[in-house]
Structure formats: C-alpha cells, structure tokens
C-alpha cells in the first residue's frame, strides 16, 4: 500500500528535494523503490491512497505529458503510469462534491488521469470508520 505520492515545483514552500538526487522525479523514485523492494513476482501495488488534494500528496508539477498527451505525469500519476495499482482510493471519488477547486490545473489533471485510466484500475472513495476497505489480499488467514 502506498499512501500519497506528491511532487512540488522547486520554490514551493512544501517542496522537498528528491532523494537520493534530482536525476528522476519523485514519482519515478517511488516506482524504483517499490520495484526494488517488492518480490519479483509481485511488482504492483494493491492499494494507493491519496489523503487529500495538495500537490505534496498527489503531485502538482505540470510539465511532462504522458504518451497520450491527455494529462501530465506527476506524483501519483507517474506511479500509476509505471506500476500497476489494484485500487486507488481518494476522499472524493466519483463526484468530488466537497471543498475542491475543480478549476485548479492540478485537480483537472488528476480528473483527466482518472477519466482516461478508469478501465485500467479501480478507483473508490475513502470511507471513514470502516474496517474492510483495505483488506489483506495475500495469506490473510495467517494474520487473523
């Protein structure tokens, strides 16, 4: 499970330099780390959770479009473009009818990404207080 995958422009007060260096974007480093640490037979994420819609949690650098040209690769989008995600969970899907500036370029980019990738992965709204939204998918009886 991945919780948040942000990316900010240098100069943004929330910007943190990519580690180990700036030769890749933060999303690319996240993918590299997961692929390095995950078992070879399990090179994917079961869940990714976006806690809220700030660039340091979902990505806000809008400079490199994906192959289709329909949205920019940044943060969680870069992760999803390079690693299979079984379920993406955020706090507003599908109607986003709470305090979200739907005219914000970063939010529009995220919506475009969801629209054009909806057949590739499941997307679901986070439900506070439930204990079954994120289930152990492998050998769960071992942890019962």
List PLM regions with ranges.
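Flexible, acidic/histidine-containing loops and adjacent segments that form or flank the divalent-metal
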Residues: 33-36, 40-47, 58-144
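Conserved beta-strand hairpin/beta-sheet module of binuclear metal-dependent hydrolase folds
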Residues: 1-44
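Solvent-exposed loop/turn segments at secondary-structure junctions
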Residues: 7-10, 52-57, 93-97
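Divalent metal-coordination and catalytic microenvironments
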Residues: 4, 52, 88
């Amino acid at each position: 499970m991945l919780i948040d995958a942000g990316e900010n422009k240098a100069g943004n007060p929330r910007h943190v330099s990519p580690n180990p260096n700036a030769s890749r974007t933060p999303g690319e480093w996240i993918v590299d780390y997961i692929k390095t640490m995950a078992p070879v037979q399990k090179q994917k994420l079961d869940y990714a959770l976006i806690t809220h819609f700030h660039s340091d949690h979902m990505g806000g650098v809008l400079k490199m479009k994906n192959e289709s040209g329909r949205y920019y690769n940044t943060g969680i989008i870069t992760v999803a473009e390079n690693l299979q995600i079984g379920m993406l969970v955020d706090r507003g899907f599908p109607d986003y009818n709470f305090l979200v500036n739907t005219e914000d370029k970063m939010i529009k980019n995220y919506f475009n990404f969801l629209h054009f990738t909806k057949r590739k992965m499941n997307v679901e709204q986070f439900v506070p207080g439930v204990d079954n939204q994120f289930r152990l998918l492998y050998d769960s009886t071992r942890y019962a």
